Amino acid sequence: MKKSGASQGQSASELISKRIAELGDWRGETLSRMRKLIKAADPNVVEEWKWMNPVWSHDGIICTGESYKNIVKLTFFKGASLKDPARLFNSSLDGNVRRAIDIHEGEEVDASAFKALVRQAVAFNSSGKAKPSKKAKS
């Protein structure tokens, strides 16, 4: 797996592991579990550290992993373009681009459906549809 986003001599993967350890509660466990599912869904995923949060990429950003007091939020950057038959997306539903999964303490996310969503995001990024179109100059 490639690593990107090194900071202060630490790789992005090390910074993500550090964040998980610092959380030390259900949020750290949840973020760790979701990280494992992302890696299982895409062995070529690139871990990055941006905006003080974990970011997983493959030909573009797949999702970020944010931790707040009451939730762990996985924001899919092109989520509005993805099919979500399992209805995992439960946040940021009104926008034209992003979709998010908010996970509260005690909640479980369907692992198979989540991995399918990650694979779909990778396929979308790799298709070139995720790249902004270039406007013609007049």
Tell me the role of every PLM-derived stretch.
Residues 1-138:
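Charge-dense, helix-prone N-terminal extensions
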